[in-house]
Regions:
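N-terminal, cleavable Sec-dependent signal peptides of secreted/periplasmic/extracellular proteins
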Residues: 1-375
Length: 375
């Protein structure tokens, strides 16, 4: 992946490739990868009898037990799926190109998905090859006592449908499939993963309260599972307090307001720090507030404020961003200032983000009007 740009710049040639794969173009490289995967999976019946644990010394284990990939067939089949689902090996589309419709059985129950025989002559389609692999894996694990591998594949083919299908009903069918899966397999940790994906879709639709409720169900069901932790993180993102401020660059009578955009907060704290504009102008390392790094922010936070105060904010029960206008502080002497905001009273860096903007207090202001781009 790091050297992808090198391969993209190469022109496809008709001559046979040399032994050094670093000189190949992308189509040739992908063709060779697929060739090796197909050759490996040709021995499927043998691979199905080889426990993946036999190769522990060679494989980098993930965060799930071997029951999710119990055999070398599972390992190689999922490697092939990762290849087909990457989208990198897409070639020029033929007239008979396979298109995955959202109203196809890709989101139907498992029995309908297994019975599905896509009507397509596009044998080169990566999506078509992936569908067949999902079906083969589901058939292989259909009678397993441990349902982990079977359930994992069933959930993955739904995610595959979400990523590659088209149609207005895609999200609705995907959500329905995830809900059906989570309810039918509520006694297995994988159901928390399904709830996480369902909550993610609902969140993307702007229904944050509903998304949090679904994610909380997944977290409480299996808190230490992969899906449980994903749900925990999603809830944390939805509940995360945020605040951003902006104001006029020049404060004079009548005083402007501080525009506060926030969520999951009921109070915001302000500090005003005075600075020497001449010194800052001659210091090449000085940057505008939007581009300050943590070190520069820390220096500001540690300075004694000219004034500090707080303002109450209406609660955001729906977790969406709200906006309030807070009156600017009166009584400041003419000069240059930084305005800092925080949702922690002590302006600490832990679980907090300090926002900074700059302004002047002056009786004068310069208004520039552009006329047809001439200034």
């Amino acid at each position: 992946q790091a050297n992808r740009y090198r391969f993209l710049q190469r022109t496809q040639t008709a001559s046979a490739p040399g032994k050094d794969f670093q000189t190949w173009d992308l189509p040739r490289l992908f063709a060779e990868i697929e060739k090796q995967l197909v050759m490996a999976l040709a021995s499927a019946e043998t691979l199905k009898k080889i426990p993946v644990s036999d190769f522990d010394a060679l494989l980098v284990k993930g965060n799930v037990p071997d029951s999710y990939r119990p055999t070398m067939y599972d390992f190689l089949a999922h490697e092939a799926l990762a290849f087909y689902n990457s989208g990198e090996q897409a070639a020029a589309r033929s007239q008979a190109a396979f298109d995955l419709s959202a109203d196809s059985p890709v989101f139907s129950d498992t029995a309908q998905f297994l019975a599905w025989k896509p009507d397509s002559k596009d044998d080169a389609s990566p999506q078509l090859k992936a569908i067949r692999l999902y079906q083969q894996l589901l058939g292989f694990h259909a009678k397993d006592d441990d349902r982990s591998a079977w359930l994992d594949v069933d959930l993955l083919r739904m995610n595959f449908g979400k990523n590659f299908s088209f149609g207005e009903e895609k999200d609705a069918r995907y959500k329905a499939a995830l809900k059906r899966f989570a309810e039918a397999h509520a006694d297995h940790p994988i159901s928390s993963r399904a709830l996480y994906h369902q909550a993610t879709v609902v969140r993307g639709e702007g229904e944050l309260v509903a998304a949090r409720k679904i994610a909380l169900q997944g977290k409480n069901r299996f808190p230490n599972s992969v899906g449980g932790r994903q749900c925990h993180n999603l809830i944390a993102e939805i509940e995360a307090p945020t605040v951003n401020i902006s104001t006029e660059r020049v404060w004079n009578d009548p005083l402007p307001v501080i525009d506060v955009r926030y969520r999951n907060l009921t109070k915001v704290y302000f500090r005003v720090i005075q600075y020497d504009w001449k010194q800052r102008l001659t210091n090449r390392g000085s940057r505008r507030p939007d581009y300050m790094d943590n070190k520069e922010r820390r220096v500001l936070i540690n300075q004694k404020p000219v004034v500090e105060w707080s303002a109450d904010l209406p609660a955001t029960a729906d977790y969406h961003e709200a906006r309030q206008e807070i009156p600017a502080r009166a009584g400041l002497k003419p000069g240059s200032y930084f305005l800092l905001s925080s949702h922690n009273e002590d302006f600490s860096e832990q679980n907090n983000r300090v926002h900074v903007c700059d302004f002047w207090v002056s009786d004068l202001a310069l208004v520039i009007r552009n006329r047809n781009g001439q200034g």
